[in-house]
């Protein structure tokens, strides 16, 4: 059997693949050996004496199965971990995600007029200061603030109503006293005139 190194090289160039992927018909070695040009190789490819082998299967089925298992938390124990906790899930990334969630919520609340810009600013700074661990806690805090504000407003309104009521009562009482005084003075002046 003659060496078909040249033919293999030319075939790989013609077929645009590696030399490993070229199949030369072992029964037709003499005919293949005579082909020493690209044109001749193309003819042999057309005749089916030289074939480009198919791509070998590299299945991802096992990989997919393992990935699904890992999502459930399998194969992720202490013994499987190589990097530090910070390398596996950076603290900065967690912080960025949390800040983006909290700031998005605050922005949405401000746009929908659920909170005013002053409350927005104070809560924004508090979020930056690591006061709120997650979105739920921030929402609860906002509801609590709003409830407190509403309660204070109600109490102040009630106090104002009470003050205005007492003011009115005092005014009426003063008017009554004034009227009584005037009446007494009138009576006294009449009596004095009667005596004269």
Curated annotation (Swiss-Prot):
Q: Subunit comment for this entry?
A: Component of the large ribosomal subunit.
The UniProt regions of compositional bias labelled Basic and acidic residues, in chain numbering, are: 159-196
Q: Which NCBIfam families has this protein been placed in?
A: PRK08570.1 (NF006343)
Which HAMAP family does the record associate with it?
Ribosomal_eL19 (MF_01475)
Tell me its family: Belongs to the eukaryotic ribosomal protein eL19 family.
Q: What is this protein called?
A: Large ribosomal subunit protein eL19
* Originating species: Ictalurus punctatus
One GO BP annotation of this record: translation
Q: What is the lineage of its organism?
A: Eukaryota, Metazoa, Chordata, Craniata, Vertebrata
């Amino acid at each position: 059997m003659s060496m078909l190194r040249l033919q293999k090289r030319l075939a790989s160039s013609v077929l645009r693949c590696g030399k490993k992927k070229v199949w030369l018909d072992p029964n037709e070695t003499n005919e293949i050996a005579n082909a020493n040009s690209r044109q001749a190789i193309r003819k042999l490819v057309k005749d089916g004496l030289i074939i480009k082998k198919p791509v070998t299967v590299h299945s991802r089925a096992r990989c997919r199965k393992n990935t699904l298992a890992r999502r459930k938390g399998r194969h992720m124990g202490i013994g499987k971990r190589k990097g530090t906790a910070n390398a596996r899930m950076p603290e900065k990334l967690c912080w960025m995600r949390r800040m983006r969630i909290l700031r998005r919520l605050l922005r949405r609340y401000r746009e929908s007029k659920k909170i005013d810009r002053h409350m927005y600013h104070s809560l924004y700074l508090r979020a930056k200061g690591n006061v709120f661990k997650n979105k739920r806690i921030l929402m609860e805090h906002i509801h609590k603030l709003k409830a407190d504000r509403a309660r204070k407003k109600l109490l102040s309104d009630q106090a104002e109503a009470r003050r205005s009521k007492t003011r009115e009562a005092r005014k009426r009482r003063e008017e009554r006293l004034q009227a009584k005084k005037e009446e007494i003075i009138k009576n006294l002046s009449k009596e004095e005139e009667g005596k004269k």
